[in-house]
Amino acid sequence: MSARILVVDDIEANVRLLEAKLTAEYYEVSTAMDGPTALAMAARDLPDIILLDVMMPGMDGFTVCRKLKDDPTTRHIPVVLITALDGRGDRIQGLESGASDFLTKPIDDVMLFARVRSLTRFKLVIDELRQREASGRRMGVIAGAAARLDGLGGRVLIVDDNERQAQRVAAELGVEHRPVIESDPEKAKISAGGPVDLVIVNAAAKNFDGLRFTAALRSEERTRQLPVLAMVDPDDRGRMVKALEIGVNDILSRPIDPQELSARVKTQIQRKRYTDYLRNNLDHSLELAVTDQLTGLHNRRYMTGQLDSLVKRATLGGDPVSALLIDIDFFKKINDTFGHDIGDEVLREFALRLASNVRAIDLPCRYGGEEFVVIMPDTALADALRIAERIRMHVSGSPFTVAHGREMLNVTISIGVSATAGEGDTPEALLKRADEGVYQAKASGRNAVVGKAA
């Protein structure tokens, strides 16, 4: 996974070392030797991640980080502060400045690439969310999901047989999050399938294999996307590498530093929240794309795609497909007499009656205006005619109540019915025959059903 990384340090040897390591892993690297240059490059180039040394003359890393986070152009870019080994105060100040994470000198390669990979994935989600929100603003849709999702605590499952360590982690997280401790990996798997935002697992647990537990989470559909942080001893490089290979999102080096814990937990929970929002938003967008907003039925676009595949299957020897084309009688008169708001009420009520009188396998759609279509898979013409007659009677049998009960309208419909005719038939021909049936039904006085054989 490649990314564009800006490395900022006033010591050239440090810059060149990081540049060489990152370039060898196919990252695109740019460099700056001071704060003002870094700010200008960040605003101009919009890198994916910024690695920023704390101790720089003139403008230190904290000031640079604050300025990046104050600028709407760059505030979304994750910043990793590079601190001294004993820099607890630096990490506290870094969090206050808006840093996403930390690296400690001397920089360990495994931790460097774990941090970069984790934040690169996070940045991809941020970019997608920002793009969706920009599109929403252009379309006049209320945006601001990222702001609403930020700052929300999460439910964190701590899987650890070291009770003292688990309690310490839970105490650190308890102010902002809702930690739950589980020492039994089998019970933890069940818990992970529930409303959990993050799992923290002891990769070096004595009574169970933490890496095997993580692999099991990744193999299950319901927990595959769940973020996992692994607690690993800093000198256990083999376990670190293996944890990352099997799908751990990031590493927590023991003993656990409270600021690093806070930063890493925040990043993973934010990423999950953003991803869940995007996934739900996509599902909603897909639903909107195939749904008529007035009636709640499928729209013409969706109907066309489904009809194409059903007719193709029928012409290749499958069961017949029938189509009902329905037109509300004198609908223009309803609009002209009572207004378009009442007309919309009639359309919504008709859609409810239509949907309640077709089978689960049928596809009722709004075709346009006052025209509706029902696609009926595996249905011969005679069966479709019976269903069409039932719909007609259900519509005409009782008045439509509109205008909050102040008006009662008698509504009737004309229905044309057709069915596929075997090899050579097309969706267009099927609907054309149904349309001819509607024309004949109206010519005969309306409130009628007419079938049209091929």
From Swiss-Prot:
Site (Transition state stabilizer) residue list: K332
Enzyme class, UniProt record, top EC level: transferase
GO CC entries: cytoplasm; plasma membrane
Modified residues (4-aspartylphosphate): D53
CC cofactor note: Binds 2 Mg(2+) per monomer.
GO molecular function, one term: GTP binding
Record-marked site positions (Allosteric product phosphate group binding, activate and inactive state): R359
Activity regulation (UniProt): Allosterically inhibited by dimers of the product c-di-GMP.
A Pfam family this chain is assigned to: Response_reg
Modification note: Phosphorylated by PleC and DivJ. Phosphorylation stimulates cyclase activity.
Cofactor: Mg(2+)
Annotated positions binding substrate: N335, D344
Positions contributing to Mg(2+) 1 binding: D9, D10, D53, M55
Pathway participation: Purine metabolism; 3',5'-cyclic di-GMP biosynthesis
Positions of the record's site feature: Allosteric product binding, activate and inactive state: D362, R390
Subcellular locations according to the entry: Cytoplasm
Site feature (Allosteric product binding, non-activate state) residues: R178
Residues that hold Mg(2+) 2 according to the record: D327, I328, E370
UniProt KW RNA-binding keyword: no
One record GO biological process: negative regulation of bacterial-type flagellum-dependent cell motility
Residues of the GGDEF domain: 319-454
Protein name: Response regulator PleD
Organism, as annotated: Caulobacter vibrioides (strain NA1000 / CB15N) (Caulobacter crescentus)
